Amino acid sequence: MGESTSSDRMDAITLRRAEAILGIANEFQSGMAPRDLLDLLPDGTLWDLSKLRHLLERSGMPLSWAGGRVFVGENPPSAHQQDHRTLRAQENWDSVQREVPRVLDGVLPVLRSLSVTGSLAFGESSEKDDVDFFAISRRGGVWLFLFLTYVAARIRRTRPGPVWCFNTVLEEEVAVRELSKPLGFVMAREILMARSLWGTDYYVHLLQRADWIRREIPRLYEARLGSAPPPSVSPTGAAAMPWPLRALNAAIFPFLATYLQLVGLLRNWRFRRGGRASELFRTHTRYREMRFTSSKFEQILQRGEGASVIPPQLGSRHRGESGPDPSR
């Protein structure tokens, strides 16, 4: 009786997590390889592929299997469409690796780390997808970084390519504090899947300190960080920006923050008039942080809350999606 109850509980946990993962993938017209799905299950759900497939097939979810992936619904994208999204993501990643150091030369030292998140980090991109960035600045550098980045992008970024969106920029103390608290399964996956462009050691150290991420997705955590050596840098105690630059950062803050809020209001007004409610977003501007959070991503977070092992503390967000790009 006890073994049966335990097995039923594990089935329920597995199914709840799988439903959330597949539902989120469906939001982006995508699916999941069963092996990748296994890597996203919590501890205690030790499934092999045949057991997982059997559980999914008797779950009642409308599922389709195509190209080695499982999809929600009866009309999965064709193999050609899947390959096209994967190829576009690789092209965008190659472009970002080439262009970011060139365009932001002289700006990157303001940061502790810079990573790509969103669809590109997951290896699939559509024609309309932006490139989402998550940046952690040195103390006193958030608004200076944003200002210099927007200027550099306007002047130096002359080659065609996907839109760059610096959707979350946090001062390092804010990032350390935020990543130390449980943010739920969806955020754990987003944070782990981020692809580092600058300050990789720093970012790895942050993740190694975030034990809640390991508890939430142990297999993926081990796959991403299990062989990583102890980083040579600490996520705390780094030198702040020199005081003249901190003063400039403070002077820029009220003007650039106001500008971004106005841009956000204008964009949202246009989205409402055009019947594009899913593209609405919030603009969060504080002295030590700036975030854009889309309504679509808020819904994804809510979808994933029931799949979290540790109840999330989502008073603030690690990152946003698809905010405005003032450099365009």
Task: Identify the residue ranges that each predicted region occupies.
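Catalytic core of pol beta-like nucleotidyltransferases
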Residues: A12-S113, T117-K128, S137-R328
